[in-house]
A protein has these predicted regions:
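Expand to "…catalyze enediolate/carbanion chemistry for C-C bond making/breaking, isomerization
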Residues: 1-231
Length: 231
């Protein structure tokens, strides 16, 4: 189409078919998909994943109090997709849809402690409401596993997903330090971690690019300010 019409059309393919869900065909299917993606790499904006479709294959559905990562069969699918398509930051892979929504009326807190939102969510302390808090917990797990952004099915989800994609200043400073250092090991910007240049380079590139797209915030306590439920 690009050659025929002289336009540049970009793609966001979605991986969600049963051949990927089934363990015995998954690797062959994913390697084949990766070969096709590589032919058009400059035109692939993002690779999406179908958590709901994978769940359907096995007749399961996560509840509002569970994460897609709690569904063992689906977790394996997502893990292998990241393994094949996410090596060396080959492609941006977004997290799956969260299917629960309820319009937020107000936040439980105006500001969280500096140590942050993950502590609240993983201890199941309320922040917005049950449906949105479940989404937030899953986005935190997305980031930990290498997903960037996610497909959303309801407008109320957008600001929460985008907010949690923002990078804290400490993460950003660490990423810049790693990318600006020739090698070896250095103390992290917060004085609380080791930054090993070579092993952490891919992480630093991903964080730096995420910061360019979603901005940098002072600390985890500032995530709540980005939720802006009344706007």
């Amino acid at each position: 189409l690009n050659d025929r019409f002289g336009e540049i059309l970009y793609g966001m393919p979605i991986i969600e078919d049963a051949e990927v869900a089934y363990k015995e065909t998954r690797m062959v299917e994913l390697v084949g998909i990766k070969k096709i993606l590589d032919k058009y790499r400059d035109l692939v904006l993002q690779v999406r994943v179908g958590g709901t479709d994978f769940s359907s294959v096995f007749g399961v559905r996560r509840g509002v109090d569970y994460s897609i990562y709690d569904i063992m069969t689906v977790r394996e699918c997502l893990s292998d997709i990241i393994n094949i398509c996410g090596r060396d930051n080959d492609y941006v892979i977004s997290g799956p849809v969260w299917e629960y929504f309820r319009a937020p009326k107000e936040l439980m807190f105006e500001e969280l402690p500096h140590h942050g939102i993950e502590d609240y969510l993983m201890k199941r302390l309320p922040i917005v409401n049950n449906e949105i808090d479940g989404l937030l917990r899953e986005v935190i797990q997305d980031k930990a596993n290498g997903f960037v952004g996610r497909t959303v099915i309801h407008p109320s989800h957008v600001k929460f997903v985008n907010a949690l994609m923002a990078v804290t200043k400490e993460e950003y400073d660490d990423a810049c330090q790693i990318l600006g250092t020739g090698g070896g090991v250095v103390k992290g910007a917060g004085g609380n971690k080791m930054n090993e240049i070579k092993p952490h380079t891919n992480w630093a590139k991903k964080v730096y690019n995420r910061a360019r797209a979603f901005s940098v915030i002072e600390n985890e306590g500032a995530f709540v300010k980005l939720f802006a439920v009344n706007e």
